[in-house]
Amino acid sequence: MAATMKDIARRTGLGLATISSYFNGGNVREKNRIKIEEAIEELHYEVNEVARGLKTNATRTIGVVIPELNNTFCAEIITGMEDILRSHGYATIVCDCRTDKKLEREAVEFLTRRRVDGIINMPVDEEGNHLKRFQKTGKPIVLIDRKIQGINCDSVLVDNKKAAEDAVRYFIERGHRNIGIIGGPEEVFTAQERMAGYSKALESAGIPVSESLIWHGDYTIQGGVRGLEELVQNNPEMTAVFVTNYEMTMGAMIGVNELGIRIPEQLSMIGFDNLQFARACNPKLTIVAQPTDGIAKEVAKVMLNHLENTGEASGELFSEKLETEIIAGKSVRVLA
């Protein structure tokens, strides 16, 4: 038979109130904490988080819903967040919705049934009705990377518009004018922001935006391959291309190799994220680097502030845009 809190109380000689306070994160004297932890180990006691959640309305679990678990950007953020949340006694349930709106809705519904204390979401669905339903529980939501109209919640974003603007300006300052872009899905917030930055940089330099130099991809490796091939085929005058996420950057490099294009002699390129991949390329790839560590820390901090400082909540929504950085390689040629 499994050990109970009463068994721990008998073993330690402490009252049930003290034992309960320990398990619910309350203040317990150090000598009592040691007694309780020794008894837990001796009795092989396991906390029934679901049962405790029914009593306290807190399960000390956080739901995380992301579009692609094998996406480097997502994976690095999850790792950083989990480390911080775990250090505060919270576990995470990670749901990979595979960039599928239906799977995302199902994931949020599943997490709601599991009575998670909050949800961290990098959203795919731009309507967010499933998130609105979760908000009715009174529990917090923190959005990463993308905002949803009509959802009043905290968000930690990257300044994607400026990221793209900086990358395109980097080309322009080195003499490039025929600059292509491999963008993301047109309906995705980050893709819209990056496309807006691309257009703004060109317009600020007096360079007309040409539709033939724009490829709307799908944030996949294969999308990067197709985008590179289409842009090169349709734009023989193109001297540079900006690829707007890591997976498509990998795909674009595959496309370059398959077509026998020399970087940067025949085509200059700026990619997105993953410094290790950029360093492995020959020549080393110039990239836009997103602050994944900073995003992870901010998201965890905002969520923990909701869960652990409820009495101090100001009622104001938190929204922050973090800056990206261009890490120069040798993939951009200076034109005479």
Q: Which role fits each region the language model picked out?
A:
Residues 229-336:
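Flexible loop/turn connectors
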Residues 1-60, 336:
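N-terminal helix-turn-helix DNA-binding module of bacterial transcription factors
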Residues 66-76, 94-103, 146, 156-166, ...:
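Hinge/beta->alpha junction and helix N-cap segments in small-molecule ligand-binding domains
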Residues 42-48, 102, 122-124, 253:
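Short gly/ser/thr-rich secondary-structure transition/capping motifs
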Residues 3-4, 34, 53, 57-173, ...:
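Alpha-helical recognition/docking segments in bacterial nutrient-uptake
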Residues 177-178, 209-213, 262-268:
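Short acidic capping loops at alpha-helix termini that bridge into adjacent secondary structure
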